[in-house]
A protein has these predicted regions:
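Surface-exposed loop/edge segments in extracytoplasmic proteins
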Residues: 1, 90, 106-112, 163-170
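Short, low-hydrophobicity acidic/polar segments
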Residues: 1-93, 137-140, 145, 178, ...
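Short, surface-exposed linear segments at secondary-structure transitions and domain or protein termini
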Residues: 3-7, 123-124, 174-187
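Exposed beta-strand face motif in extracellular beta-rich ectodomains
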Residues: 19-23, 150-156
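Conserved structural position at the C-terminal beta-strand
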Residues: 27, 158-160
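Edge beta-strands of extracellular beta-sandwich domains
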Residues: 35-39, 165-173
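Short helix-loop boundary/capping segments
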Residues: 62, 70-73, 77-145, 150-153
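Intrinsically disordered, low-complexity repeat and linker tracts
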Residues: 184-218
Length: 218
């Protein structure tokens, strides 16, 4: 959590006390209006992972409103914990595992919401490997994504060094990923395939939100 300050000192005026204004702000800042956002397909380096996120605020306010902008994460955060079943896939089998995610990496802003860009095909994404895996798991990964619906689409893929490959396709309505939310997937690799469970589906990812206050000007 840190401080944000506007670079432009030009104030925002309300012409009447009943007029409603739409305020849209984002960080990192840019000289032009934020209309689209792209996450890195290869997030194996921590810098690429962190640079895939942005904060934004979209509020409708009147002059007498409490003028606070609450910044939210624009992307989806995935935490993926992986282990073998201990029978058909051992911890040794998981060494040098290749875990990938298929998803659209380009999004567009509409009415203050980020959504996957139309007509863009899914890209193979590589997540960031955490130094310490969750207890009971061999590996833990993190990935930042554009909000989208992965229902009925190949989502995860696991490739083992012995040539075995596994995939996971969420069922109808099970792959909806909302911006500003964190999804923890616990993945078991083995027979007959991937056993995937979601831990506390759609938990709000608001731990780093910022509030910026305005001043009274008419």
């Amino acid at each position: 959590s840190g401080e944000m300050s506007a670079k432009n000192n030009d104030p925002l005026y309300w012409y009447t006390t009943t007029e409603e204004e739409t305020l849209f702000a984002w960080y990192p800042s840019s000289e032009t209006l934020l209309t689209e956002w792209t996450v890195a397909s290869d997030q194996t380096i921590e810098e690429s992972y962190k640079n895939s996120d942005f904060l934004y605020a979209y509020e409708k306010m009147k002059f007498r409103s409490e003028r606070k902008l609450k910044f939210h994460h624009g992307t989806v955060k995935l935490i993926i914990n992986v282990k073998g079943d201990g029978d058909t896939v051992s911890e040794e089998d998981l060494k040098d595992i290749v875990f990938t995610v298929s998803a659209v990496t380009k999004g567009s802003m509409a009415e203050g919401k980020l959504q996957s860009a139309a007509g863009v095909e899914a890209t193979v994404m590589k997540p960031y490997l955490l130094e310490n895996a969750r207890e009971g798991y061999a590996y833990s990964f993190q990935l930042l994504m554009i909000p989208q619906d992965m229902s009925g689409k190949l989502f995860f893929k696991v490739a083992l060094k012995d040539g075995r490959n596994f995939g996971h396709t969420p069922g109808n309505g099970e792959g909806i990923l909302e911006g500003g939310h964190q999804y923890t997937y616990n993945v078991g690799v083995g027979k007959p395939g991937l056993k995937v469970t979601i831990e506390k589906d759609s938990v709000s990812w608001d731990g780093d939100d910022e509030e910026v206050e305005g001043t009274d000007r008419e």
